[in-house]
Amino acid sequence: MAADLKTADIGVYGLGTMGSALALNLAEQGFRVAVSNREADWIAPFLEEAGPLAGHLSGHATLEDFVDSIAQPRSILFMIPSGAPMDAMIDAVMPLLDEGDTIIDGGNADFHDTRRRAAAFDGTGRHFVGMGVSGGEAGARNGPSM
């Protein structure tokens, strides 16, 4: 399900409205972008609809393959619902990460959750960034406020 990319510059997990638009924006800027989604059947249609930008995108059905496809140190943008889904994702992805890797929570999380998550990363050698994304689908595709 992957394009012919060996190593992505960044990963975007979550191909809903905002995640898919951000992935296309990054690809349009020349970045090699690995993408994945909880429902893997969203990946192939996304790549098909990407048109010529698909050459900068690689789709991955499993979290393990997704993480492995990103150049180290990894930067992974999660565009998933805030709260419990993000906590569960952190638990799932942490064993797959290496020192120096960065997780970016692009959901609009409560700042208390962001502080708690960042504190949990202290001393792990991995990094957590809470980054809200504003501008809706058009902003995400053409120039979001982050």
Language model regions located:
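Residue-level recognition of oxygen-bearing side chains
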Residues: 65, 75, 85, 116
